[in-house]
């Protein structure tokens, strides 16, 4: 059965324009282009951090992710299902290839900012044996974030110090999430949870694999975000905190709390003496932190006219692109 839904519109898109100059001051002419109409577009500034499972550090773990700064910005996380190792299959191969194809098909005109369609194309092209949970998020220039997710990779939006949106994990039963697979019995893009969220300038997006969200609470995420000077620092700090919790046998983690709520616990004799299922969950930990920013984009009108005025504007655009564009696949 397909599990597709759309999130409620949370707020109208709002991108703040710069303050209007005083009428008593002369207008300053841009040194890059003639005065003309301009528009605001939403873009993502993205930071990432990955920490493999302690026992998989030498191989890099089974998580993979993809980040691209073109247009508004795109990122994706895939978590290879470790159970395939019992069949002598490297679980990392499927997740890595899936992310590689996500990068390739992002440039396909047919995708056109549709993460579910991108998921379909990337999955269809993946030939490695295995399976993975996955989430893809794409920001349109209007500030609309489109999400497609299969399984228990997650995403949260933080606005003004509060979590105002979270994806919901999909699972067959506890600890058995939906997953894209090389086998016919697995899920497909039609089973994806599809969400649309209207974002505002300054909103923070935190996404990652279940190894991250199983070991950290919302209030900790909000606290780290508020204390971090940038997205790179935030992603690293969040991953390190989740890693610390994951190896702490006394930490009552979100994972252990969920397990107890589903009926999993220590034997009765341990309960009798006050024992309970507790501790973090060791796993690969992938964290992506993105901040929504508004950039002023000149209107297309008059572009041809400017091309004859020298190379200065082209250089400015090239510098902006090199600072904003990030296109990578990391495992």
Swiss-Prot record:
<dbReference type="GO" id="GO:0009507">
    <property type="term" value="C:chloroplast"/>
</dbReference>
<feature type="region of interest" description="Disordered">
    <location>
        <begin position="300"/>
        <end position="331"/>
    </location>
</feature>
<keyword id="KW-0464">Manganese</keyword>
<feature type="binding site">
    <location>
        <position position="210"/>
    </location>
    <ligand>
        <name>Mn(2+) 2</name>
    </ligand>
</feature>
<feature type="binding site">
    <location>
        <position position="79"/>
    </location>
    <ligand>
        <name>Mn(2+) 2</name>
    </ligand>
</feature>
<comment type="similarity">
    <text>Belongs to the PP2C family.</text>
</comment>
<dbReference type="GO" id="GO:0046872">
    <property type="term" value="F:metal ion binding"/>
</dbReference>
<keyword id="KW-0378">Hydrolase</keyword>
<keyword id="KW-0904">Protein phosphatase</keyword>
<dbReference type="InterPro" id="IPR036457">
    <property type="entry name" value="PPM-type-like_dom_sf"/>
</dbReference>
<keyword id="KW-0460">Magnesium</keyword>
<protein>
    <recommendedName>
        <fullName>Probable protein phosphatase 2C 1</fullName>
        <ecNumber>3.1.3.16</ecNumber>
    </recommendedName>
</protein>
<feature type="binding site">
    <location>
        <position position="283"/>
    </location>
    <ligand>
        <name>Mn(2+) 2</name>
    </ligand>
</feature>
<dbReference type="InterPro" id="IPR001932">
    <property type="entry name" value="PPM-type_phosphatase-like_dom"/>
</dbReference>
<keyword id="KW-0479">Metal-binding</keyword>
<feature type="binding site">
    <location>
        <position position="79"/>
    </location>
    <ligand>
        <name>Mn(2+) 1</name>
    </ligand>
</feature>
<feature type="domain" description="PPM-type phosphatase">
    <location>
        <begin position="48"/>
        <end position="292"/>
    </location>
</feature>
<feature type="binding site">
    <location>
        <position position="80"/>
    </location>
    <ligand>
        <name>Mn(2+) 1</name>
    </ligand>
</feature>
<dbReference type="GO" id="GO:0004722">
    <property type="term" value="F:protein serine/threonine phosphatase activity"/>
</dbReference>
<feature type="region of interest" description="Disordered">
    <location>
        <begin position="1"/>
        <end position="29"/>
    </location>
</feature>
<dbReference type="InterPro" id="IPR039123">
    <property type="entry name" value="PPTC7"/>
</dbReference>
């Amino acid at each position: 059965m397909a599990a597709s839904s759309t999130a409620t519109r949370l707020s109208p898109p709002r991108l703040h324009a710069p303050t209007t100059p005083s009428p008593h001051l002369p207008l300053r002419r841009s040194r890059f282009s003639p005065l003309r109409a301009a528009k605001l577009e939403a873009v993502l500034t993205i930071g990432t951090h990955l920490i493999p499972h302690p026992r998989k550090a030498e191989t890099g773990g089974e998580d993979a992710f993809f980040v691209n700064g073109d247009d508004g910005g795109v990122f994706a996380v895939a978590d290879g299902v470790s159970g395939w190792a019992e069949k002598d299959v490297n679980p990392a191969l499927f997740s890595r290839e899936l992310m590689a194809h996500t990068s390739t098909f992002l440039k396909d005109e047919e995708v056109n900012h549709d993460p579910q369609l991108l998921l379909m194309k990337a999955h269809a092209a993946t030939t490695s044996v295995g399976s993975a949970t996955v989430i893809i998020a794409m920001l349109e220039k209007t500030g609309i974030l489109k999400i497609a997710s299969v399984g228990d990779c997650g995403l949260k939006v933080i606005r003004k110090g509060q979590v105002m949106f979270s994806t919901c994990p999909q699972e067959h039963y506890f600890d058995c999430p939906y997953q894209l697979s090389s086998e016919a019995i697995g899920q497909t893009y039609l089973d994806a949870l599809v969400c649309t969220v209207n974002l505002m300038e300054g909103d923070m997006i935190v996404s990652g694999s279940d190894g991250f969200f199983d070991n950290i609470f919302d209030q900790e995420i909000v606290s780290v975000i508020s204390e971090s000077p940038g997205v790179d620092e935030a992603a690293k700090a969040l991953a390190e905190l989740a890693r610390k919790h994951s190896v702490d046998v006394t930490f009552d983690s979100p994972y252990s709390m969920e397990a107890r709520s589903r009926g999993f616990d220590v034997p009765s004799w341990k309960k009798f003496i006050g024992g309970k299922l507790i501790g973090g969950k060791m796993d690969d930990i992938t964290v992506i932190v993105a901040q929504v920013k508004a950039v002023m984009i000149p209107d297309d009108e008059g572009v041809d006219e400017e091309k004859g005025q020298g190379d200065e504007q082209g250089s400015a655009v090239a510098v902006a692109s090199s600072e904003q564009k990030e296109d990578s696949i990391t495992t």
